[in-house]
């Protein structure tokens, strides 16, 4: 659905800079360019026993723009659940946009969220959490909130295992494992107790903000590479890239690492579709 940072790519400030010093943002305005990135999010299309389910991880502030592009393209209509990694705007800023589904497609959407993040939602989306405060007849998202613990749970017959990580000092975020797929979108540190949950991971989708260094809240590519070498997944897709990460140039670098180290790694991109067995 999306593979970019909170502000997305391209940045307005880069496009309006008369010096045009940002090549990635300049490329990102081209139709179909893989440097164009909206808020980090994935959609799991799971063919379980009752039928196919669409499970969304995060609905950030650019979610509706992503849905406009990818839902029609891939024949997606319903949202059967939303799982929240953390309570920043790039993960929950699109909750209000879910009204299009609950008003026109389905009666409600279950939301799975940690208690600490639900407390934030009570402030940022108070009128969705407590619909008694809105005017009668007003159309808002009809959401069913389910509080997650840091232990496995089941959504539409799919087992989901939370992967607790740090997203800045003292700020907890969650990755998730489903089958042998591990998704960690917002991370600055992986606690030791989380590594056993990553054992035998086949596809790792991992945060990699920038090419040169980490920030206080996100892995940069050098640290992300260290983690890949430690976790040893069969394949790695990096996500959460800012405008310093040129899709073609970084992928060329990762291809060279595959030749020298045997590590299968690449930058993901918005709209990437990955068939998996769950």
Whereabouts are the PLM-identified features?
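Binuclear metal-dependent hydrolase catalytic cores
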Residues: 1-184, 193, 251-278
């Amino acid at each position: 659905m999306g593979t970019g940072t909170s502000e997305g790519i391209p940045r307005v400030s880069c496009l309006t800079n008369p010096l045009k010093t940002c090549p990635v943002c300049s490329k990102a305005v081209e139709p179909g360019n893989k440097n164009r990135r909206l808020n980090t999010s994935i959609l799991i299309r799971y063919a379980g026993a009752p039928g196919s389910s669409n499970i969304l991880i995060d609905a950030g502030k650019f979610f509706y723009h992503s849905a406009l592009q990818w839902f029609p393209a891939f024949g997606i209509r319903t949202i059967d659940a939303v799982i929240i990694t953390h309570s920043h705007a790039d993960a929950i800023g699109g909750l209000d946009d879910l009204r299009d589904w609950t008003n026109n497609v389905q009666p409600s959407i279950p939301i799975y969220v940690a208690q600490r993040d639900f407390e934030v939602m009570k402030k940022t989306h108070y009128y969705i959490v407590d619909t008694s405060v809105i005017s009668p007849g007003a159309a808002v998202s009809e959401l069913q909130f389910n509080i997650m613990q840091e232990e496995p749970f089941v959504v539409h017959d799919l087992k989901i295992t939370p992967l607790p990580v740090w997203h800045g000092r003292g700020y907890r975020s969650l990755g998730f494992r489903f089958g042998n797929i591990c998704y960690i979108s917002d991370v600055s540190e992986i606690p030791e107790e989380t590594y056993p949950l990553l054992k035998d991971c086949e596809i790792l989708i991992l945060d990699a903000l920038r090419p040169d260094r980490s920030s206080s809240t996100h892995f940069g590519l050098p640290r992300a590479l260290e983690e890949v070498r430690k976790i040893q997944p069969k394949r790695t897709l990096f996500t959460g890239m800012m405008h310093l990460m040129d899709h073609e140039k970084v992928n060329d670098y990762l291809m060279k690492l595959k030749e020298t180290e045997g590590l299968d790694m690449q930058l993901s991109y918005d709209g990437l579709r990955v068939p998996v067995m769950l």
